[in-house]
Design a protein with these regions (language model features):
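Thiamine diphosphate
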Residues: 1, 9, 25
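C-terminal binding/interaction regions
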Residues: 2-6, 19, 72-90
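S-adenosylmethionine-dependent methyltransferases
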Residues: 3, 10, 35-39, 71
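N-terminal acidic leader/helix
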Residues: 13, 17-21
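Acidic-glycine-rich active-site phosphate/pyrophosphate-binding loop
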Residues: 22-36
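A short glycine/serine-rich beta->alpha loop
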Residues: 37-47, 90
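An amphipathic alpha-helical micro-motif enriched in hydrophobic residues
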Residues: 48-62
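Phosphate-handling active-site elements
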Residues: 62-74
Length: 90
């Protein structure tokens, strides 16, 4: 998965101007983002997981513009998802 993901991010990054931000995903952010996707996929309709991660990414960009570091913004997005996602009974 990591090789494919890195290739994908690199291919997208090549389409951006050199002045644009890097699309590299720091290792310490991968697990929280995957956890967000898992929580949403298992607590709601599965189709919400990729949409939630997209919206979370936009949230992180907006919070970064406000001076909040990425790790904090990802944690905020994850906590919000946890708070509003119903837990399914086993």
């Amino acid at each position: 998965m990591d090789d494919w993901f890195e290739k994908y991010a690199e291919a997208l990054e090549k389409r951006l101007d050199s002045s644009e931000a890097s699309l590299h995903l720091p290792g310490h952010l991968k697990n929280p983002i995957l956890t967000l996707a898992r929580i949403v996929a298992h607590g709601t309709e599965r189709k919400n997981a990729p949409l939630a991660t997209y919206v979370a990414g936009r949230y992180v960009v907006a919070r970064d513009a406000q001076g909040v570091d990425e790790a904090t913004a990802v944690t905020e997005a994850l906590k919000i998802a946890e708070a509003i996602t119903p837990t399914r009974e086993s």
